[in-house]
Amino acid sequence: MKYKILDNFLNEICLNYLSSLKLKKISSDEVYSYQNKVYSNGDIINSCISPEILKNLQNSCHENAIKILNELAPNKTHLYEYSDFNIIETGKDYTFPIHRDHVNKLLSGVIYLKPAANTGTIIYKNKKGENPNEIEWKKNRALFFSRTEDTSWHNYKGDGKNNRIVLVYNLMTTNTKAVCKLEGINYNLIRLREFTNPYIYRFFKKVF
């Protein structure tokens, strides 16, 4: 899988704000996602991040993200509609299943927020978990990739010591049919996946 790693990705204002968010308490064996969106027309849907910071994130990150998408999957760039800026807290004893991202994610990104040390996102050769490659945790390090059907298997987990808090930054589309056509996959098969296991696919659409 092709991917990009960038250190010091967020500006100081956004990094300090996101690192100091007061989140609800979760148990050590669960994960919680806070959803925030910025649309290409400027509309905002927010939960835990203020509109001002979301505007700052969009203004300071979008150009770089589009450049990365143009590098990794240039045929998808024209489908962009909105950005996800989701805060994901993973309990110290929780392990998210190995998965590939939903087709509506044109570019998938994660920025490590806190603590100072934890388990990084792990990339695999396949769903079986062969050839694991952990992207080492470093505060304000960003990992980006553009999903494909066969080469974007990954997961994440707590380190058994501290909860893991990240910003998941995705470039998104609602035109899943067009993405399926570009990737050469069966749109009806994707719809069948969602129908047969809607809970998992709704959740995978939210998280990294």
Map each language-model feature to its residues.
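Non-heme Fe(II)/2-oxoglutarate
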Residues: 1-75
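Short His-Asn-centered micro-motif
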Residues: 6-7, 100, 146-147
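A short coil-to-beta-strand element that immediately follows conserved catalytic motifs
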Residues: 74-86
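Conserved short histidine dyad/triad with adjacent acidic residue
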Residues: 86-102
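Catalytic core of Fe(II)/2-oxoglutarate
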Residues: 93-94, 103-105, 116-208
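Substrate-binding/active-site groove segments that recognize
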Residues: 109
